Structures are given as C-alpha cells and as structure tokens.
C-alpha cells in the first residue's frame, strides 16, 4: 500500500467506526513525539494520540468524510499530504459538520505507511 492508499484507508476507517490508532507511528527516542491536531484538541506523543483516537471512536458515530482535493507527494520513506475535507459526525446526540483542511506527514516503517504528524483545522471566512 502506498501513502495515498493509506490516507484513503484512514478515511474509510473513520467512516466505518473502525480503529484509527493503528495508523499512527510509535514514538522513537531519537525523535520528537508524534503530534495530532484535531478540530478541538492537540495530542502529543504516540500514546496520547492513540488513546485520543480510541476515545473518539468510542464516543462518536455516523461519520461523513468527503475528500475534495487530496494531494500527496511520496518519496522513499516519507510522504506528505493536504486535503480539503467535508467532515461530519454524531456525538452526544448532536450532529457536528465542518469544512476542514488536513495536512500531514507519513513515514514508511516496517513495511507500512504511518502518520507521524496530522493537522486538521476548520476553514473559516475572515
């Protein structure tokens, strides 16, 4: 699977309520920690990111993920991407819907592509 396919697989897993934590790399002692910024949180360190994603999967449902402009560049062991994503989900009896911007970095480790950084922000007019 290449980096683009990994990103599509992540989107599909989000839509279907499947585990997301496995898409993220473990921290390495020689590197700074993995970071994931979502619409409402910033998680630092692989353990925090993975627990945050498990909590998200447990507390949300009915995800809509509409990728509108995925752009991926892949090199030997690193890839980066950006996307414009329509995002919606149910949580606590309330529907949340946002136009979001995604960017991130993946690294090829042990035969798989894993996120080492992910940033999701809400697009707003000024």
Write out the residue ranges for each language-model feature:
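Short beta-strand edge/turn micro-motifs at domain boundaries
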Residues: 80, 97-126
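Hydrophobic/aromatic beta-strand elements that line small-molecule binding cavities or substrate pockets
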Residues: 53, 67-72, 85-87, 100-108, ...
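Hydrophobic residues on conserved beta-strands that form the core of alpha/beta folds
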Residues: 65-67, 82, 115
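Short, aromatic-enriched amphipathic alpha-helices that serve as compact interaction elements
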Residues: 1-19
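A solvent-exposed, acidic/Ser-Thr-rich amphipathic alpha-helical stretch
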Residues: 21-70
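Short, cysteine-centered beta-strand-loop-beta hairpins and adjacent loop/turn segments enriched
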Residues: 88-96
């Amino acid at each position: 699977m290449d980096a683009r396919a990994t990103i599509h697989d992540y989107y599909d897993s989000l839509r279907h309520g499947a585990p997301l934590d496995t898409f993220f790399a473990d921290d390495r002692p020689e590197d700074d920690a993995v970071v994931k910024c979502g619409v409402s949180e910033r998680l630092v360190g692989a353990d925090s990111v993975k627990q945050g994603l498990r909590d998200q999967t447990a507390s949300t449902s009915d995800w809509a993920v509409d990728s509108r402009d995925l752009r991926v560049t892949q090199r030997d062991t690193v890839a980066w991407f950006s996307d414009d994503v329509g995002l919606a989900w149910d949580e606590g009896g309330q529907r949340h819907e946002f136009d979001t911007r995604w960017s991130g970095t993946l690294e090829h480790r042990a035969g798989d592509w894993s996120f080492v950084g992910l940033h999701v922000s809400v697009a707003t007019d000024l």
